[in-house]
């Protein structure tokens, strides 16, 4: 593998000094880019796009061709793992992801087993390897997975949900069943992320997208311990290089200090928490990633620049900040807005550190 030409992102995750604040965006390869939409059209379906290593590589690289981003992230979907468990993932027009066989009966739950990522998910590993080769050492590649709780939400609900009625009912009436789902899913996530690392991922991120729908007590029972189980099982070093881990709970500001204590290298923040206050709470224990409101990218260029500087100034010129949005970029974002954001973050963060 080629030696990294730009390791700013990895050094920031490890809280090492950097000349500027590195930046990447959740969903940076996505529908706001016309070239992505063209590749998606050629693929035929979203799942076909995910399952083609060549096309997944193509769309992963598209935002890097447009913008001076400091990391690439594997193009895939968090629901590949439950799909590999046999739940039958499909995408209904206008409804988003659905499962043909959601977990509703106890016998289905007791029969749930972790898939072999080198068998059922080999197409993801092939994509990781192909992307690493195509990057040629330009920037690091991030692998990712959904969190056990977030995956379980989809697996039990059968798709997206407004009220999480089925999984919360299970949590409060049959917690033993839910814990079984979470244990199997956590072990699946560990194996999946480690396989990505073995295939070439240089950092990994766990998306706990629905952790914020839980109460304080429920989060500490059904999400946090399984995030800790995942982090504890990850490969920490490969080929003499550290493999940093990022954990992101959307709506998880309440539990920031607890998340920072599970052993991950960085904690992702959504836009609802001041990043300066977050840094004061966690100190130098972990790096922080975030946390611009994605909706700011609909604003005029001067507003985008002002708000990006606000985030950078709040964190300050300290090591350990990766700039990102507080959630995924909207499909309606004007591509030129991202150019303003990237240029502002790189230029202003250099000035904060006394550079030009």
UniProtKB/Swiss-Prot annotation:
Pathway: Porphyrin-containing compound metabolism; protoporphyrin-IX biosynthesis; coproporphyrinogen-III from 5-aminolevulinate: step 4/4
EC number(s) stated in the UniProt entry for this protein: 4.1.1.37
GO terms for MF: uroporphyrinogen decarboxylase activity
Origin superkingdom: Bacteria
A single BP term in Gene Ontology: protoporphyrinogen IX biosynthetic process from glutamate
Location in or out of the cell: Cytoplasm
Catalytic activity: uroporphyrinogen III + 4 H(+) = coproporphyrinogen III + 4 CO2
InterPro entries (UniProt xref): UROD/MetE-like_sf, Uroporphyrinogen_deCO2ase_HemE, Uroporphyrinogen_deCOase
Site positions (Transition state stabilizer): 77
GO cellular component: cytosol
Main subcellular location of this protein, as a coarse class: cytoplasm
Binding locations of substrate: 27-31, 77, 154, 209, 327
Keyword Cytoplasm included in the entry's annotation: yes
Assembly behavior: Homodimer.
Described purpose of this protein according to its UniProt entry: Catalyzes the decarboxylation of four acetate groups of uroporphyrinogen-III to yield coproporphyrinogen-III.
Protein name (database record): Uroporphyrinogen decarboxylase
Native organism: Aromatoleum aromaticum (strain DSM 19018 / LMG 30748 / EbN1) (Azoarcus sp. (strain EbN1))
Name of the gene this protein is made from: hemE
């Amino acid at each position: 593998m080629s030696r990294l030409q730009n390791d700013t992102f990895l050094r920031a995750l490890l809280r090492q000094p950097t000349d500027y604040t590195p930046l990447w965006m959740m969903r940076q390869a996505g529908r706001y880019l016309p070239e992505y939409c063209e590749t998606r059209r050629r693929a035929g379906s979203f799942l076909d796009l995910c399952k083609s290593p060549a096309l997944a590589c193509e769309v992963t690289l598209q935002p890097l061709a447009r913008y001076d981003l400091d990391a690439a992230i594997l193009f895939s979907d968090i629901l590949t793992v439950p799909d590999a468990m046999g739940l039958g993932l499909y995408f209904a027009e206008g409804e988003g992801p659905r499962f043909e066989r959601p977990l509703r009966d106890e016998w289905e739950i007791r029969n749930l087993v972790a898939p072999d990522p080198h068998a059922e998910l080999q197409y993801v590993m092939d994509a990781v390897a192909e992307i690493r080769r195509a990057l040629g050492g330009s920037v690091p590649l991030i692998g990712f997975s959904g969190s056990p709780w977030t995956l379980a939400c989809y697996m039990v609900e059968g798709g997206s949900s407004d009220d999480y009625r089925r999984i919360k009912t299970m949590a409060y009436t049959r917690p033993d069943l839910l814990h079984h789902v979470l244990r199997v899913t956590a072990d699946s996530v560990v194996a999946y992320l480690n396989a990505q690392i073995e295939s070439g991922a240089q950092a990994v991120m766990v998306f706990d997208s629905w952790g914020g729908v839980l109460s304080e007590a429920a989060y500490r029972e059904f999400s946090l311990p399984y995030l800790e189980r995942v982090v504890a099982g990850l490969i920490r070093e490969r080929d003499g290089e550290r493999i940093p881990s990022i954990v992101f709970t959307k709506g998880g500001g309440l539990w920031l200090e607890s998340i920072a204590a599970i052993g991950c290298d960085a904690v992702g923040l959504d836009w609802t928490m001041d990043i300066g206050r977050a840094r004061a709470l966690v100190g130098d224990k972990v790096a922080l990633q975030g946390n611009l409101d994605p909706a700011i990218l609909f604003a005029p260029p001067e507003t985008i620049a002002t708000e990006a500087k606000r985030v950078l100034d709040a964190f300050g010129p300290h090591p350990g900040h990766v700039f990102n949005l507080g959630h995924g970029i909207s499909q309606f974002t004007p591509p030129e807005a991202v150019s303003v954001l990237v240029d502002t973050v790189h230029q202003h963060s250099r000035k904060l550190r006394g550079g030009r």
